[in-house]
Amino acid sequence: MLKSLKSRRLILKRLVTLLLSLFFSYLIFSASRNVTSSNKLNNHASERTAVESSAFNWIEKRQHQVRSENLMNRLSAYFLPFLSRSSHKERVLLRQLGNNEIAKSDKCRYIFEVLYKIDPDWDNAQTAKFYNVDGVDNTLASLLGERLRSYDYCFLSGQLDPTAIFANSTVNPHDLQNRMFPFLKKINEESKTVMWPIITDMTTGEAVPAPEVDMESSNFNGNFWSNWNRLSKGRGFVLTIAEKDVPLFLKQLKVMEFSKNELPFQIVSTGNELSAESIAKISETAKETEQRVYLVDCSTVLDTNFANTYISFFQNKWVATLFNTFEEYILLDADVVPFVGSDYFFDSPSYRESGILLFKDRVMENEQTFQYCIEMLNEVEPSAQERRFIGSRLVFDSSLPFSSETSEEASVYYNFFKKLRLHHVDSGLVVVNKLEKLNGLLMSFMLNLDGKLQRCVYGDKEIFWLGQLYAGQDYSINPVDGSIIGPVNEEPENDDGHKSGMYYICSTQIAHSDSKNRLLWVNGGLKTCKISNSAEDDFGREPEYFKSRYGDISKLKRIYDASLNVEGLIVPDVSVHPWMQIKECSNYMYCAYATGDGHTNSELDEGRLITFTEKELRYINDISRTWNAN
């Protein structure tokens, strides 16, 4: 009996020894794996480190802390978790995260739980304020980029449902959405109504019913962007217009009728931009021109206080980019005139490849942004920790060498970030696949709301490509510089009697063409001067200048009110002949120059003059007359 008892004790002792050996081996193996993972991170030493309040910075420190704990702490976490600073479950999660062995759902849940743990009061609305302290403004911008990319990684591109991921979590998915996108209407799990704009058919005056959804309203609202994108259908034109833009939009509708357009229009508003009188005028013209026009009132999906405080002027365009119901659309300013059908833009190879097509602005080399803006934007790039944990990558970033000659997009990036050139994109017409580019559009909206970044760019123009860039998306920019159309003039003969060979066009319009010299669209309407009362204002401002050239106000007014006479197009080489701004049309008129052997369509050494066939000129000027018809 005694021998049997001793034998059992010996077996039990050996079993305990074996279990402890296995446990220690596991700890050593785990530590070695984590060291390997840490070494991988150190390979990216040239990349920036996450800011102190970053969720990824906290997670990395937590991993280091767990790895450095002594054996007793590890045993305590396993056998006596209530005495440990970290649970065994968290230790396993951190190890899996470091070795990229974790399920995305668990990773995403942990990332956002950490976000709330670091700062229970975090809110992206903080970026809309300008603190005028670089450390504060830049840190908020950095956190904004990190949070939006994390949200995209998990719930937009990642296609996880936040209402399911956070079902048993300390994070409330509705609260997360409220803080991530402060412009959205504040919702909670008790919401009984599906978030949807009020849409009115302006030709009939009837409301368009909201679609039926196959889920509870709280679930729909708690994963709003994925559900919104899922219900977006078809193609169309999208605008946001103020009262002053209504006469221009009516002209645009008449041009669309002339061009036999068949796509619908959606005018997207925050709720109160248009008067009843303006709505009636649009409705009447829509019926006359047989164009389908819808008014999309977003007051039901926007936070009223935030919208009234921060959404104005250029920010309204982002409301239009996000809250139209199309899958693909062409975003237009009211004074844009297309000369090709919508299929041209949607079938463009560069658009089909990237999902968004932008066009270049005039090249103005003497207008620049600020170095402090570049320093701020560099902080928006993914940190080394973010790259490690969720794999964020950008097409271009400040830590990688690249050639500005590889693409138009690379050239624009180089000229903005290295040369500080301010103007690159004309956002009067943008072609967008919303299903593919939603995360970039959300990034753009939030960047354009940023209190500091608003001081770095002109309006919304550059934010279109910057938003896609920092969302990790690609984008396409038409390679032809912004140009000018109008009557072609030749400089006087030289002193020796020979022709100067220099041609110029002066007008207020920005024209856009393709690599085959085809005129695509114009920004600025087709009136010689679109600025109301400009003749009177010009004479009042510079009486001697305008009297010496035009005699009196009535003559200048007749010139300004005339239809633009199009004879040709010039794409200037600004390194030889920069754009010249002149005093006409309240300083809105520019002149561009090109030299060459007569009116040819060849690419000239010093700028390019494009002339049109008789058929092309007839069509272009018919559109000009249509635009200017009463």
From Swiss-Prot:
The keyword Glycoprotein applies. Belongs to the MNN1/MNT family. This is Alpha-1,3-mannosyltransferase MNT3. Pathway: Protein modification; protein glycosylation. Residues 32-630 are lumenal. The keyword DNA repair does not apply. It is found in: Golgi apparatus membrane. GO terms for biological process: protein O-linked glycosylation. GO terms for cellular component: fungal-type vacuole; Golgi apparatus; Golgi membrane.
